[in-house]
Amino acid sequence: MKYLFSLFLLSFFYVVTVAQPLAGNETHVASTPDTYAIVIGISDYKDPDIPKLSFSNRDAEVFADFLMSAPGGNVPKQHIKLLIDSVATIGEVDKAIRWVMNNCKEDDKVYFYFSGHGEMENVTMSKNGYLICYNTPSVAFVNMGLSIDYLNDIVNTISVQTKAKVIVITDACHSGTMTGSKFKGNFFVGEQLMLKKKNEIRMASCK
């Protein structure tokens, strides 16, 4: 299933990338926009209580390679923050987010790709969702996970305030291990990830 999702992504972005110059040549001549990407893939977590995933790290590497290829837009390697397994701590993820916000400008394109575990808390009525980083503990993921509310705020700030195009791609597996319940977990995580504004593209596979 994960391979099918990855294949769909590569096919989709190949079409989008190839078609863009044709759509833009008619009316708009401007400086070439830059592309930045945060690509995260975590298969092996620090906390042994968090189940391992088989292909998340490899999927992230494949996506980063695609972005650097001609069909993916020839994105310079220095414009891609690739965070795999133990490198993908909450601190490094936040650092990468700030790096993008400090560098992107109007009409740029920003990719945020995450493949790994997603989870939601079941204490509040909001059922807030989180993306689980490498060093996020299973017993305190609310404090050391990447809040989807925070991620949505970042994405909206870049798309609305900076006026850059943002593409959010998440392949987040919800196991229910950290909350003790699988009930509607993938629905809530996926629903929160799909709250988008103008100038944003979002794709989520939540299982």
Please give the residue ranges for each predicted region:
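Active-site-proximal C-terminal subdomain of hydrolase catalytic domains
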Residues: 41, 84, 166-207
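Caspase-like (clan CD) cysteine peptidase catalytic core
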Residues: 19, 23, 27, 34, ...
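Positively charged n-region of N-terminal signal peptides that target proteins for export
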Residues: 1-4
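Bacterial N-terminal signal peptides
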Residues: 6-16
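Short, solvent-exposed loop/turn elements at domain surfaces
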Residues: 45-52, 76, 140-141
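Glycine- and acidic-residue-enriched helix-capping/strand-helix junction motifs
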Residues: 46-61, 65
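Signal peptide-proximal N-terminal region
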Residues: 62-78
